[in-house]
Amino acid sequence: MFVSLENLSSESSFRTGDIKKVMIQEKLKDLGHPVESLSLGKFDYIGEFTAKKQRSPDSENFHSAGAFFRPNYERGMLIYSLIKSQKLESYLEIGYGRGYSCFCAAMAFSELGRGSITTVDPAFNEDQVRSLASVFPQDWFSMIEFQKGTSDEFFDMQVPRDFDLIYIDGDHRYDFVKRDWENCKERFKSYLIFDDYHLPGKVQKDMEVSAVVDAINDYNKELIIMDRRVFHDDRGYSDDQINYGQVLIHRK
C-alpha cells in the first residue's frame, strides 16, 4: 500500500503551465510514425480489453453519445511510436491500471523482435491479467515482468537498473508523484512520460502532477495534447478545449 503522508506540501498548489505544447499528430509525425502509418484498429483492439470505459447512466453523454468511450487511446500510440522509432529496449511503468500502456509497449517490442517490460502496481488483478492471456499473443507476455507492490517497494528491493523509457502513472497526489520522480530521474536513459498533466484552470481532486512537472528543470519537456485527438471524440471538444495531456521528458 502507498504510505499515508501528512498534509500536502505547499508546493502542491503551485503550477505555472509554462511548458511547450505539441499536438499528438505532430509528435507522431516527428517520430516518423504519422497517424496515417499506424493501424488504429490495433490500438482499439488492445483498448477494448484494457482501457474502454463506461459512462454513468446519469451523465448527459450517456444519452447523447453512448454508454462507452475510448479515453486517451493516443497514449498507447505515443509509447508504441517512441519504442519503434528510437529502437528502445526496456520500459518501466509505475501504475499498470488495466494494462493498456503495457500491452501497447509489448506490441512495439514484439515487432522489433526484442525488449523487456517491467510494470509495477500494488493492486494487480491477477485474474484480469490471466484473462488477457487468451486475448493477446503469448510472446507479449514473455516480455513482461509483473511486480506487485508500490513504486517505493520496487525501487528499495531492486539492484539499480536503468530503463530506456519510464512511464509514471501511479498515485497522482503531489507527494507520491514527487517521490516517483525522485526514484526515476536517474533511471531513465532516453525518455520519461508523466500521465495527467493539467494546465492551470483545470482542477480535479488528487490530480497534482503539474506542480511536480513545473518544478523540473534541466530537461526538455513537452506537453502532448492527445485525448481523443486521433480517435473519435463524441464529446465534440475542440483542440483548444483539451487543457490536459501527458508530458514527455528527455535529456538535453
What are these regions (language model features)?
Residues 1-70:
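Rossmann-like AdoMet
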